[in-house]
């Protein structure tokens, strides 16, 4: 004997619209905080890069008895691989001090 076919109703168009509206509202609330967190992470990454480069400037000075003329000298000599921040900000070296370019 066959089982009777039970008709299961799906979502109506109105129900789907309500679900999509709720998801959209949740995204509108969540996206700004995620964007802010990305900016904070980028700034922290830049601060860490500055500290790393400053340490390598001191190592260069110890090895060569003079300060490097620019950050590219650190890269050429193999002290670092990158001389810019992860968030794209440029860095400069003046009188042995690494700083973020304005």
Curated annotation (Swiss-Prot):
Location of the protein in the cell: Cell membrane; Cell surface; Fimbrium
Transmembrane feature ranges: 11-31
Cellular component GO terms, alphabetical: cell surface; pilus; plasma membrane; type II protein secretion system complex
Keyword Cytoplasm: no
Keyword hit for DNA repair: no
Residue ranges of the propeptide: 1-10
Mode of membrane association: Single-pass membrane protein
Keyword terms of this UniProt record: Cell membrane, Competence, Disulfide bond, Fimbrium, Membrane, Methylation, Transmembrane, Transmembrane helix, Transport
Disulfide bonds: 46-85
Domain of life of the native organism: Bacteria
Region entry May be involved in polymerization of ComGC, spans: 9-34
Sites of N-methylphenylalanine modification: 11
GO biological process, alphabetically ordered: establishment of competence for transformation; protein secretion by the type II secretion system
InterPro entries named among the record's database cross-references: Bac_GSPG_pilin (IPR000983), ComGC (IPR016940), N_methyl_site (IPR012902), Pilin-like (IPR045584), T4P/T2SS_Core (IPR050470)
One protein family per Pfam: N_methyl
Subunit: The transformation pili are flexible filaments, consisting mainly of the major pilin ComGC and smaller amounts of the minor pilins, including at least ComGD, ComGF and ComGG. Homodimer. Forms higher-order multimers. Interacts with ComGG; the interaction is probably direct.
Family: Belongs to the ComGC family.
Function: Major component of the type IV-like pilus (T4P) that plays a role in transformation. Transformation pili are dynamically extended and retracted, perhaps thereby promoting DNA uptake and transformation. Required for transformation. Required for DNA binding.
Protein name (record): Competence protein ComGC
Organism of provenance: Halalkalibacterium halodurans (strain ATCC BAA-125 / DSM 18197 / FERM 7344 / JCM 9153 / C-125) (Bacillus halodurans)
């Amino acid at each position: 004997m066959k089982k009777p076919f039970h008709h299961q109703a799906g979502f109506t168009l109105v129900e789907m619209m309500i679900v999509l509206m709720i998801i959209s509202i949740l995204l509108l609330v969540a996206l700004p905080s995620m964007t802010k967190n990305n900016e904070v992470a980028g700034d922290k990454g830049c601060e860490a890069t500055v500290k790393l480069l400053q340490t390598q400037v001191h190592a260069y000075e110890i090895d060569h008895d003079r300060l490097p003329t620019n950050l590219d000298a650190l890269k050429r000599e193999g002290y670092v691989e990158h001389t810019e921040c992860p968030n794209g900000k440029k860095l400069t070296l003046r009188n042995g001090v690494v700083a973020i370019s304005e």
